């Protein structure tokens, strides 16, 4: 009836899966009993000449070529939800001779997670999320996001291992359902991130953690008044730290940032991302970009959103927790960290426990190893504090796969360039305030050129622990003192290896040793070309990218960016008019 409302695209976990989809002897395993998910898959397979869903198929014991994983249900609101089992899986368990040779492909259906731009705020509210579904919600998903559906085909189940098991039919059904749910949950988490719908639950779990309870008990020494006081203080710290990520807000950010990137930047170039996509479903990612500008937060989150990876929880300095700005950043996933808390043991315990809970729940995390913005383009030494805390949080969770992802972010024009020039000229660095942050927006009206995000070689935390094992937890402090700088150096090295030499960098270097107040255009072009040839001949690393524009094009780009006066249209370029 509503077929005309549904338009889907798809992604397959492997090339083998893609080929098998045209094999008529496959069985689909849907992640839910949703009728609109079923309808979307039915329409998509028919339109793309893939194996269609069949309600009657005599070749299979289940008499059709699909089954659906059933969600827990309850008849009355006060009842505990009861786990429901797939009847079709029970039949497959009874017919093991058939099932061990069957091709079973699990299927996920996502509504509104495709990277097309939304043109209606209602679409933003009824995209895929962790929230429960209902008839009304499904109807709105169909109406507002039916043209924006993504279908994900997993690799086939390992039926030979499953159905050769000596277990009873009942246990086999339970085992297969657990396996399927784990796959669906992992894939859903990779696309949406962990369930963030209840901030209070996270806060409560942190406050009830053993580390905080033990600290309060040791400090209060049984004094109820002191215990209450410390617990209130811990609660205050947790609420101060935690993010408040909101899907509707994120979708609205998407619309605003799409306008910003498309209207102000010539290009947002993404390099070496595919390796990160490959490891994302099985690995918790800790994004570690260099820090040039406040735009860094937006650029990386925007990219991950459009690449269909979970948005990270972002470590932000408490100096950004300003009125109006702070709540908006929290909605986008930022959590706040004080610059120094070495003398506040309770805050340290709370922050550590918060970080540990994020890692346990499978959140990806983003932090800036330099600690502050380096607008000069030169990387600063890594700050050991947050790196050390992440290492501590990971100890005891060896079964989790965690990787640091170094990222080099480069701009042709940095928005905060003027404030940096003032600091170089002797002005003191100001504390962040609303006026300074909003003053950056005045440059939003201007052309900002190109931006580059290049992903460096991931660093496996598991491999690092094998290289530097901690044999005795009593020596944890010495171990951290030894390993933290090693990890920090590797992150910064991989960022540096992935740098992009922009047109602005080439232009700046070319005029740096000019001995007069002007330079001929011909001389400037030849200097730029010489620098490019030297950089290519003595490339810093295989991942280093050098601007491909010619010398003439780079000079034109500097005019567009506003660095050269419009008066410089003759054969000589004045170096006193540089802006």
What spans do the regions from the language model cover?
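Membrane-interfacial terminal anchoring regions of lipid-handling membrane enzymes
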Residues: 1-579
């Amino acid at each position: 009836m509503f077929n005309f409302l549904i338009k889907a695209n798809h992604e397959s976990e492997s090339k083998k899966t893609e080929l098998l989809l045209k094999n008529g002897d496959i069985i689909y395993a849907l992640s839910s009993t949703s009728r609109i998910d079923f309808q979307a898959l039915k329409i998509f397979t028919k339109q793309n000449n893939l194996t269609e869903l069949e309600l009657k198929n005599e070749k299979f014991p289940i008499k059709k070529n699909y089954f659906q994983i059933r969600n827990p249900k309850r008849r009355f609101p006060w009842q505990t939800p009861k786990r429901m089992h797939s009847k079709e899986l029970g039949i497959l368990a009874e017919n093991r001779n058939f099932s061990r040779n069957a091709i079973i492909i699990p299927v996920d259906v996502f509504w509104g997670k495709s990277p097309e731009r939304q043109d209606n705020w209602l679409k933003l509210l009824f995209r895929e999320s962790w929230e429960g579904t209902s008839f009304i919600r499904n109807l709105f998903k169909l109406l507002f996001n039916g043209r924006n559906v993504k279908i994900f085909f997993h690799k086939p189940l390992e039926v030979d291992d499953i159905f050769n098991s000596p277990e009873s039919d009942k246990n086999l059904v339970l085992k297969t359902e657990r396996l399927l749910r784990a796959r669906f949950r992992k894939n859903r988490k990779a696309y949406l991130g962990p369930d963030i719908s209840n901030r209070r639950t996270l806060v409560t779990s942190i406050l009830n953690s053993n580390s905080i309870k033990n600290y309060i008990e040791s400090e209060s020494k049984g004094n109820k008044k002191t215990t209450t006081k410390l617990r209130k203080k811990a609660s205050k710290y947790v609420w101060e730290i935690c993010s408040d990520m909101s899907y509707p807000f994120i979708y609205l950010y998407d619309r605003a940032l799409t306008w910003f990137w498309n209207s102000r930047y010539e290009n947002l170039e993404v390099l070496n991302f595919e390796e990160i996509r490959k490891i994302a479903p099985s690995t918790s990612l800790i994004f570690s970009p260099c820090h040039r500008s406040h735009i860094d937060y937006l650029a990386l989150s925007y990219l991950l959103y459009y690449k269909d990876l979970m948005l990270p929880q972002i470590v932000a300095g408490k100096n950004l927790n300003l009125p109006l700005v702070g709540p908006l950043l929290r909605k986008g996933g930022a959590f706040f960290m004080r610059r120094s808390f070495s003398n506040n043991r309770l805050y340290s315990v709370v922050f550590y426990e918060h970080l540990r809970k994020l890692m346990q729940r499978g959140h990806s995390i983003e932090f800036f190893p330099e600690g502050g913005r380096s607008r000069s383009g030169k990387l600063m030494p890594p700050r050991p504090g947050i790196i050390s805390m992440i290492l501590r949080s990971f100890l005891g969770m060896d079964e989790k796969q965690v990787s640091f992802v170094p990222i080099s972010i480069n701009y042709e024009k940095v928005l905060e360039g003027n404030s940096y020039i003032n600091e170089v000229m002797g002005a003191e660095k100001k504390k962040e305030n609303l006026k300074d942050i909003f003053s950056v927006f005045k440059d939003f009206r201007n052309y900002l050129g190109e931006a580059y995000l290049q992903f460096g070689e991931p660093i496996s935390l598991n491999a690092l622990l094998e290289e530097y094992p901690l044999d005795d937890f009593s020596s944890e402090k010495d171990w951290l003192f030894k390993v933290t700088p090693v990890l920090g150096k590797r992150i910064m090295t991989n960022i540096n290896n992935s740098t992009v030499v922009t047109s602005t960098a080439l232009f700046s270097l070319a005029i740096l040793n000019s001995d007069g107040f002007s330079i001929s255009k011909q001389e400037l072009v030849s200097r730029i070309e010489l620098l490019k040839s030297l950089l290519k001949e003595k490339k810093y690393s295989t991942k280093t990218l050098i601007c491909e524009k010619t010398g003439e094009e780079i000079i034109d780009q500097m005019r567009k960016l506003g660095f050269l006066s419009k008066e410089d249209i003759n054969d000589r370029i004045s170096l006193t008019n540089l802006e």
